[in-house]
């Protein structure tokens, strides 16, 4: 131990979607490295449980990332209570699967709203912080940003969108010394992925991927790489590292996926009917319950 403070020591870091899964793991990793963490999510009690496990100072805010006014309010409260954020991780996300033609329009739209619009609202709320601190914004994306897959149209569309959004922000804020990075992930061991595996069509689609592409990575491992990218202000981070190579062949991926889908989907449909999954995982169910409560 040298006693030398790391780049996150004493800094304020914001994580959305922090109540569980990758968001909670990123919050723990940030806290382990000396950051004061602001946790944002839909589940107040679950956020508090995460907060209470962190080794360093942290506070939590219940918020829907698609609510402009609430996110602006949270950003003001973070500044007042903790100080300006030096790092923001836009991690909040939802997923649903199944055939597009039979998908529930409101559920499909909600995935786009949370994953893409929610990321934009998060950035808008915290850009004043990052301008002040010359901070860093990490946009969580996916292999789905690079290559789309059938039966995951909303998720793939949203992740392609957040990748482009991240590139646009990086170019726009570079002269202000605000860093923007994009985190490309493959399968991460969260309740969302475990829930997806309960649906035959999604489980079979993943099983038909090449072995390296279907491997599931622990959330803690992914979080460690994401936080290292925050410390180093990386323009991009890939977990696993081989995902970077897919950027070189992304133009060839759509026809390959189309050919494979044309061959495999009829066989899968004979095994089990294709049905919409609804929002996946405990986070998806919490989001649906939160919206029902707001409407009721």
Q: Which residues are covered by each model-predicted region?
A:
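SDR active-site lid
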Residues: 175-241
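Conserved glycine-rich Rossmann-like NAD(P)H-binding loop of the short-chain dehydrogenase/reductase
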Residues: 33-49
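The beta1-alpha1 cofactor-binding region of Rossmann-like NAD(H)/NADP(H)-dependent oxidoreductases
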Residues: 63-73, 105
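Active-site helix of classical SDR
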Residues: 123, 158
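Residue(s) in the substrate-gating loop at a strand-loop-helix junction
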Residues: 142
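Conserved glycine-rich cofactor-binding loop
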Residues: 12, 19-20
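Substrate-binding pocket helix/loop in short-chain dehydrogenase/reductase
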Residues: 99-100, 104-109
